């Protein structure tokens, strides 16, 4: 069996390791357009759950990587000098460059052929390959040549973001929000190795335009951002690495394969960085694809069917959560107006995957602060009462709680106007 992987990112490399390890007589080759030590971006994030999966799949790479991780259990939400810490968020960060180098090392140990500075434009040279894995990233050339077959859809979102680094040490994942005369900016930040942290700055397109940023002027970007986040950077500078302002593309594909080509990683599906699942998604899909190839070998249709069966629902669930989170940040000028604890709670629950009950288990002190702020503002003497069960006043009417049941379908009004059915129904009860 011969398998060719186009793209030497975490997903492509991890797939190659797992397949070659399980099927040593399989020929596995990886072609990467960049140099072996090139890496764009700074750090990557994994959850405790994902790390556990890596341990069971390839202990060797897990042992190599885990010594390089920066771990944290806390998440901070900061807004214009106010800050609250929420515990119970098990994550770790790692340098993307270090991760790639360690995965490359494991590939060589297992006998995977690695080819760097190999820009693949024509797949005909791999006509003898049983499977071609298109792991060539968010701007996948292979996907672009087969958009109709894959059913590719790309939606460019409106917010602007730029990926930078800093020497500023951080002991938690932190969201720094800053209000400016132009609008709201947020920095998604975390430490990924000793003395280095990732800083992803995001704002709405309108705010970005008002502030006078340029897409590719890195020097100007650093100057302006450093001034906005002067207090948060605490004397530390920002570091660029081809750090251009971008807009996030939400990529979906109706099919993940065509002929003997199969999509992996960002070429297949993107998840907004605000939920930290991009690299996780790629590597978990690499596991499923490797399992499918190991099970069905050269029966490519069975391989691809099983791959989608294992991952389609999970990928779409993560994408949905990421898109909901993305939408929250597109509306952050509205959210920023809330009282601080309510705002922090909104940040934590923005993807709808985390609920009040989840947070109460992770950090009961935080949810107590949220309720206390809410009840104090509402004039309730019991500061532990759930918001849903507090009275609510609408003009001259006060109801006992805030729970609303949706009406039955027959109560629907046409264009917001009552019909003869409503007149008869309510008239009979007058």
Describe the residue ranges of each PLM region.
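Conserved FAD/dinucleotide-binding core of flavoprotein oxidoreductases
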Residues: 82-89, 95, 110, 171-250
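Conserved Rossmann-like nucleotide-cofactor binding loop
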Residues: 11, 15, 36, 139
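Glycine-rich FAD pyrophosphate-binding loop
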Residues: 20-40
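Conserved N-terminal helical subregion
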Residues: 48-165, 364-377
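Conserved mid-domain beta->alpha element of the FAD-binding
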Residues: 4-21, 133-134, 164, 244-324, ...
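Conserved N-terminal glycine-rich FAD pyrophosphate-binding loop of Rossmann-like flavoproteins
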Residues: 35-53
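Flavin-dependent oxidoreductase catalytic cores
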Residues: 368-430
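C-terminal helical "tail/cap" subdomain of flavin- and related membrane-associated enzymes
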Residues: 6, 67, 291-381
């Amino acid at each position: 069996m011969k398998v060719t992987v186009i793209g030497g990112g975490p997903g492509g490399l991890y797939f190659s390791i797992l397949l070659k390890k399980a099927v040593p007589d399989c020929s596995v080759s990886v072609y990467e357009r960049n140099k072996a030590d090139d890496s764009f971006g700074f750090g990557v994030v994994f959850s405790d759950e994902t790390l556990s999966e890596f341990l069971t799949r390839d202990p060797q790479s897990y042992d190599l990587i885990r010594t390089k991780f920066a771990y944290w259990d806390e998440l901070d939400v900061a807004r214009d000098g106010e800050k609250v810490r929420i515990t119970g968020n098990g994550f770790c960060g790692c340098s993307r460059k270090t991760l790639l180098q360690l995965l490359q090392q494991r590939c060589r140990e297992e006998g995977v052929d690695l080819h760097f500075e190999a820009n693949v434009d024509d797949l005909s040279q791999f006509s003898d390959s049983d499977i071609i894995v298109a792991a060539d990233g968010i701007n996948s050339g292979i996907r672009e040549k087969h958009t109709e077959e894959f059913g590719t859809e790309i939606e460019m979102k409106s917010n602007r973001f730029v990926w930078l680094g800093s020497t500023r040490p951080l002991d938690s994942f932190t969201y720094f929000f800053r209000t400016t005369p132009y609008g709201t900016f947020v920095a998604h930040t975390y430490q990924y190795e000793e003395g280095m942290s990732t800083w992803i700055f995001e704002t709405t397109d309108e705010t970005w335009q008002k502030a006078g940023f340029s897409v590719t002027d890195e020097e100007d970007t650093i100057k302006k951002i450093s001034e906005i986040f002067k207090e948060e950077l605490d004397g530390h500078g920002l570091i660029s690495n081809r750090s251009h302002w971008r807009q996030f593309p939400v990529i979906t594909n109706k099919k993940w394969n065509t002929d003997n080509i199969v999509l992996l990683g960002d070429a297949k599906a993107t998840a907004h960085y605000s939920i930290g699942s991009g690299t996780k998604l790629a590597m978990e899909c690499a596991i499923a694809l490797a399992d499918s190839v190991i099970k069905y070998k050269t029966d490519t249709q069975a391989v691809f069917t099983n791959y989608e069966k294992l991952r389609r629902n999970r990928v779409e669930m993560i994408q949905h959560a990421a898109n909901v989170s993305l939408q929250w940040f597109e509306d952050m000028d509205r959210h920023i107006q809330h009282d601080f604890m309510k705002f922090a709670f909104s940040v934590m629950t923005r993807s709808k995957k985390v609920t009040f009950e989840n947070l109460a288990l992770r950090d009961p002190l935080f949810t107590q602060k949220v309720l206390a702020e809410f009840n104090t503002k509402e004039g309730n003497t019991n500061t532990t009462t759930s918001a849903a069960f507090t009275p609510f006043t609408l003009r001259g009417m006060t109801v006992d709680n805030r729970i609303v049941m949706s009406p039955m379908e027959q109560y629907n009004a046409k264009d917001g106007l009552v019909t003869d059915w409503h007149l008869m129904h309510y008239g009979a009860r007058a």
